[in-house]
């Protein structure tokens, strides 16, 4: 018996190449082995297909995996007995009875994703299909202990979802700052001083469940690639323009983190027109952050007669303020282009996505200006576009990563009972 499943890409796992270890059996032929091993691999192949989100008939699963319909029936029976697969409908046939349509049981696994900021924590719960069942936003009210913040938020969103906390298979937390790729521990989060080395161990000890902390901009890039402006792109950068500045780099379909996890901390990038940093604990003291960060954008807006409480609102006001707003947008785009051109000189990406509150607010008006600015100071002409992710991209990326992890756990749990 041979197993030869047809590759069927999942947007969630495409967004996270580093989590794809669970796909090792896909697209390969099984080596000769015991019947128990073959049953296990076949069951995993069928479950993997159904985790893609489609409802499939027995004949379709047979076609995709290359095994007989009789074997597929046995596979599905075993998966049904384990509560992983169910009959979800029927497909009308040209002849004979309708064919049963199989799907994964959505409640076979649940996950949670969080986006932790200094003044707000957003969270959501989804089932293993990726369907979001509840979300909440919580003001931490000055609390800074990671375990306290996460516990309170997760308990609240699980209560809203009607899901027991103990049923969560994975938890992914997005936060600003540097995350050590070797340990997974946060190392430098200026706005979240309590999120330092040891936070991940504390969270795992408290939850006794898989927990991942990831840089917020990296998660946003995963969301862009799965369902935003970078769908299908294997090489692109996401430039985050918000309260802080950040960069996520996807090269060859993989996220580039750097040796210490600091790749993308472009707020520290030395640029012309801004002083050098004197203290890395204060990013706004110099570099690109001092030129194009939120504080600098608000100051620039005031100089153009555009008073607004936030940088994003200043950009929105500029879009409807005629020539006065155009002058502000031109100068802002020039500043952003200086940083983007520096990135392009090293990476030469074909696509640059402008994200964050400012990038989203600026839309194509800002993106087109940045593209023109980059072209005037750099020989290549990358395509520059605004974010295409609806809603909160960091939280969406966290949910995608969590679902991918839950699916990996589910696939790994499939073992022959005999």
Predicted segments with their positions:
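Phosphate-binding/catalytic loop of phosphoryl-transfer enzymes
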Residues: 114, 128, 170-286, 403-418
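ATP-binding/phosphotransfer module of carbohydrate and carboxylate kinases, centering on a glycine-rich
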Residues: 1-12, 16-90, 94-167, 207, ...
């Amino acid at each position: 018996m041979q197993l030869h499943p047809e590759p069927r890409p999942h947007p969630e796992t495409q967004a996270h190449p580093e989590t794809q270890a669970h796909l090792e059996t896909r697209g390969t032929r099984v080596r000769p082995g015991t019947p128990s091993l073959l049953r296990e691999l076949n069951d995993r192949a069928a479950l993997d297909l159904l985790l893609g989100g489609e409802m499939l008939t027995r004949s379709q699963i047979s076609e995709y995996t290359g095994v007989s319909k009789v074997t597929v029936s046995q596979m599905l029976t075993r998966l049904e007995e384990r509560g992983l697969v169910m009959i979800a409908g029927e497909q009308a046939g040209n002849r004979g009875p309708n064919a049963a349509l199989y799907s994964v049981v959505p409640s076979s696994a649940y996950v949670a994703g969080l986006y932790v900021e200094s003044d707000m924590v957003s969270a959501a719960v989804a089932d293993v299909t990726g369907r979001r069942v509840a979300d909440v936003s919580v003001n931490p009210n000055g609390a800074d202990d990671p375990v306290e913040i996460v516990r309170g938020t997760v308990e609240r969103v699980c209560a809203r979802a009607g899901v027991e906390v103990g049923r969560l298979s994975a938890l992914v937390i997005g936060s600003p700052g540097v995350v050590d790729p070797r340990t997974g521990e946060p190392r430098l989060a200026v706005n979240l001083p309590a999120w330092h080395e040891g936070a991940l161990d504390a969270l795992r000890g408290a939850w006794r469940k898989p927990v991942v902390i990831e840089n917020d901009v990296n998660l946003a890039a995963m969301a862009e690639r799965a369902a935003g402006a970078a769908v299908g792109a294997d090489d692109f950068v996401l430039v985050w323009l918000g309260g802080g500045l950040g960069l996520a780099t996807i090269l060859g379909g993989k996220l580039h983190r750097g040796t210490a996890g600091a790749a993308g901390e472009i707020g520290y990038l030395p640029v012309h027109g801004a002083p050098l940093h004197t203290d890395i604990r204060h990013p706004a003291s110099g570099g690109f952050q001092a030129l194009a960060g939120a504080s600098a954008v608000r100051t620039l807006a005031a100089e153009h007669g555009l008073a607004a409480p936030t940088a994003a609102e200043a950009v929105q006001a500029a879009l409807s303020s005629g020539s006065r707003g155009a002058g502000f947008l031109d100068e802002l785009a020039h500043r952003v282009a200086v940083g983007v051109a520096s990135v392009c000189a090293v990476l030469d990406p074909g696509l640059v996505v402008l994200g964050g509150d400012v990038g989203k607010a600026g839309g194509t008006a800002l993106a087109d200006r940045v593209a023109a600015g980059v072209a005037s100071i750099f020989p290549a002409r990358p395509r520059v576009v605004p974010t295409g992710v609806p809603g909160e991209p960091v939280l969406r990326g966290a949910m995608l990563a969590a679902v991918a992890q839950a699916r990996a756990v589910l696939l790994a749990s499939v073992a022959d009972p005999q």
